[in-house]
């Protein structure tokens, strides 16, 4: 399967390194806003083709799957371009800036009979099944609460600090905390409350409380100006689970009701962690599927809708590029 990368920034580098270490997929083409930038990227990371415009790459019939690596403010516009050009799409999180854009893309993909999926890597990683299996075993009893945080000192990064790039902590890192809670507690959400500290028009530190059916709750924090331990805790009636780094789990530890460690699990070695979403796309395409089981379209729309509601409660409106 030949991969085309749309955009040549930092996250594109990670995907290029990932694909270079995989079997049955190929770093084939990269497109940037200038040919010189694309050519330099292609030479450094071993791509066969470099294009100085997105349209040129999308016209290449050899491209099987496009990975969108641009700021999420432009995901809708770029994903739409890909679909209209007949390309399958793996779009970096946050998938779009709102649920309405996500619905439009999924409808277009269905019309074009193409695969499109959100590249939120934690949904595809082996650690997800490891956590599910621990919970299913009953060792921690009935799960009633989740606490998670994800904060990075990235407030000066352009995509974070600029409202016109859909900046702020929520869409960039908060999406991981909401997905972490959702993977554990499900989709039967009753209420969401959130507060934030804003700087220059974007949210820099957010706290989110989510209440689910069955009297279960998630308490989440995300931020773009401080460092946190990135921990996730899953609390049950007989014990609890601690996940070291919810953004790329490094260790999963199980404790009993006496706070004694009873088991610890290490996720398998990986290239970067991005390989799992690429593998999921390859499987789905080979099987004629139009979405990945790991991140169904309905779930992307649901999570985007949660974030829409949070921003609405803050009065934060994001410019749309459509």
Regions found by a protein language model. Name each.
Residues 1-45:
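N-terminal Rossmann-like dinucleotide-binding module
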Residues 265-279, 295:
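Active-site loop of classical SDR/Rossmann-like NAD(P)-dependent oxidoreductases
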Residues 15, 48-106:
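Beta-loop-alpha module in the N-terminal Rossmann-like domain of NAD(P)-dependent dehydrogenases
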Residues 103-121, 141-146:
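Rossmann-fold dehydrogenase core element
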Residues 65-67, 213, 280-322:
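C-terminal helix-rich "cap/oligomerization" subdomain common to oxidoreductases
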């Amino acid at each position: 399967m030949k991969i085309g990368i749309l955009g040549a920034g930092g996250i594109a580098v990670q995907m290029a390194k990932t694909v270079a270490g995989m079997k049955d997929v190929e770093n084939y083409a990269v497109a940037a806003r200038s040919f010189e930038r694309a050519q330099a990227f292609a030479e450094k990371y071993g791509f066969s083709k470099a294009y100085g415009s997105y349209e040129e790459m999308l016209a290449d019939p050899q491209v099987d799957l496009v990975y969108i690596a641009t700021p999420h403010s432009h995901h809708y516009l770029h994903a739409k371009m890909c679909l209209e050009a007949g390309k399958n799409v793996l779009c970096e999180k946050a998938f779009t800036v709102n649920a309405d854009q996500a619905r439009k893309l999924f409808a277009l993909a269905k019309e074009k009979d193409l695969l499109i999926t959100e590249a939120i890597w934690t949904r595809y990683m082996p650690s997800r099944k490891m956590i599910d299996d621990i919970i299913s075993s009953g060792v921690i009893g009935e799960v009633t609460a989740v606490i998670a945080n994800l904060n990075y000192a990235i407030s000066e990064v352009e995509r974070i600090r600029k409202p016109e790039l859909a900046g702020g902590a929520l869409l960039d890192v908060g999406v991981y905390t909401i997905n972490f809670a959702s993977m554990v507690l499900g989709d039967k959400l009753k209420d969401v409350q959130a507060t934030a500290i804003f700087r220059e028009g974007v949210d820099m530190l957010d706290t989110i409380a989510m209440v689910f059916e069955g009297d279960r709750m998630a308490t989440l924090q995300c931020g773009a100006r401080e460092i946190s331990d990135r921990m996730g805790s899953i609390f049950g009636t007989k014990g609890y689970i601690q996940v070291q780094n919810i953004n790329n789990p490094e260790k999963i530890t199980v404790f009993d009701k006496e706070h004694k460690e009873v088991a610890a699990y290490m996720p398998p070695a990986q290239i970067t962690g991005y390989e799992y979403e690429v593998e999921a796309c390859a499987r789905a395409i080979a099987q004629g599927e139009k979405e990945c089981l790991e991140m169904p379209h309905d779930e992307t729309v649901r999570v985007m809708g949660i974030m829409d509601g949070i921003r609405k409660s803050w009065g934060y409106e994001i410019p749309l590029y459509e």
